[in-house]
Amino acid sequence: DALPMCKGDSFPLDGVLHSVRPMCIGSMPVFVENQREYTIMDTSRFGRVTQVEVGALMVGKICNTPGQGRIRRGEEKGHFAFGGSTIILLLEPGRVQLNSEIFRRTARGQELPVRQGQQIGTAHDEEDMP
């Protein structure tokens, strides 16, 4: 079934391809300099969500599925050529409670691999919102 979500166009941000491994992130501004592409999605449950794909060394290319409109849960939005990389989600304040494991790992400087469909948090119900 279609989710109450609408995907907009994707916008590329040219850049170089540094490694996105944790030891490299502290020594170079990979989230600013690396090739990136972003898409803004309007959702009924999570509000406005911006997904930023960050290219990396040995990945080389971000391939987003073109077009706008309704999307379905699990439907491919795009992929990285030659392997995985990093995805950054920008969420509206107070709309989502992220899983505590994300904060624990981040505090220890550790990565937390996430697979497609894996829950990373829960939406706050409208009555819980600030």
Language-model features: locations:
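Contiguous, well-folded functional domains in the mature portion of proteins
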Residues: 1-130
